[in-house]
Amino acid sequence: MAARQQQKGTGFGVQYEDFVPKSEWKDQPEATILNIDLTGFAKEQMKVTYVHSSKMIRVTGERPLANRKWSRFNEVFTVPQNCLVDKIHGSFKNNVLTITMPKETITKVAYLPETSRTEAAALEKAAKLEEKRLLEESRRKEKEEEEAKQMKKQLLEEKEALIRKLQEEAKAKEEVEMRKLQEEAKAKEEAAAKKLQEEIEAKEKLEERKLEERRLEERKLEDMKLAEEAKLKKIQERKSVDESGEKEKILKPEVVYTKSGHVATPKPESGSGLKSGFGGVGEVVKSAEEKLGNLVEKEKKMGKGIMEKIRRKEITSEEKKLMMNVGVAALVIFALGAYVSYTFCSSSSSSSSSSPSSSSSSTKPE
């Protein structure tokens, strides 16, 4: 048995060891016999094939070893010229493969001359050399094919690895881009929600401020109205008091002292004078009241319209100025009425205090 020559591996982690078996040729008169020593191989682990194109016999086989290793062989033998190809047969016994190749013509070696034997030996040697050459060429081709196959397989594996790497990088990049887009969309959504909330809060504050301003305006107008009504009421009360005092002065009789006693006699002249005086003041006050009443009515109508405009936020600067002018005019009229009443009351009290003394001096008894 020949020694193991070289080891070859594949991408799957399995290593092959090439095995070169020993072979022996035997030339017999009836046939040519080839014995191949295949110790360690079973019959099912080998294969014998005849190649018609090259007239050669190919013997191949492989068997497993330990540690994911395999032993294999691939041998080629040339079939002799004087051979019946259809009757080639083989047998496997005691680890030896025997291939029998029957001859077309049976030769008797014992009766051949010496020259024939020499020629037969030379032919056999040439056949062995040709067989060796063909075997080496076949092995070289197989080696080249195996190397090409391994190179192709390696390139395919590298290509697949590169494709996997590119796919993984593209997938990772796509995931990063998708995560980035999601974060940007989330940030935009949060910013939009925050902006909307701020706008809503600002709008609510603006509405509250406008409502508060409207309430203040209404309260101011209400206070002005109440103040004007209070002043009007006060003037009316003062007027009623003044009128009642005038009536008492007009109806009070004048006492005249005589010798027989005192007699109350009215004085039409003075009464008419007082009446005329009271009448003049009354006319002034009455005119002021009428003007004030008209002004108040007008102010009420304007106030209602202005209040409606304030509620609708339609009041203008001219209407505000007009409201201020109306208030000032009312105050002026109230002051004028108060002044006239005060002047009249002062003159009435001074005349009443001087009249009794004059009457008493004129009616003093003799």
Curated annotation (Swiss-Prot):
Annotated segments matching region 3 X 14 AA repeats B of [IMA]-[RK]-K-L-Q-E-E-A-K-A-K-E-[EK]-[LA]: 163-206
Gene3D superfamilies registered for this protein in UniProt: 2.60.40.790
PROSITE patterns: SHSP
Keyword Repeat set for record: yes
One Pfam match: HSP20
Record organism: Arabidopsis thaliana (Mouse-ear cress)
Compartment annotation: Cell membrane
Listed GO biological process terms: defense response
Protein's job: Seems to not be involved in heat resistance. Unable to mediate restriction of long-distance movement of the pathogenic tobacco etch virus (TEV) without causing a hypersensitive response or inducing systemic acquired resistance.
Lineage: Eukaryota, Viridiplantae, Streptophyta, Embryophyta, Tracheophyta
Region (Disordered): 345-366
Record protein name field: Inactive protein RESTRICTED TEV MOVEMENT 2
Domain sHSP: 14-121
Gene designation: RTM2
Extent of Low complexity compositional bias: 346-366
Top-level taxon in the UniProt lineage: Eukaryota
Topology versus the membrane: Single-pass membrane protein
One GO CC term on file: plasma membrane
A- repeat ranges per the UniProt record: 129-133, 135-139, 156-160, 206-210, 211-215, 216-220
6 X 5 AA repeats A of L-E-E-[SKR]-[ERK]: region residues: 129-220
B- repeats: 163-176, 178-191, 193-205
InterPro entries on file: A-crystallin/Hsp20_dom, HSP20-like_chaperone
Annotated transmembrane regions: 322-342
Keywords, in A-Z order: Cell membrane, Membrane, Plant defense, Repeat, Transmembrane, Transmembrane helix
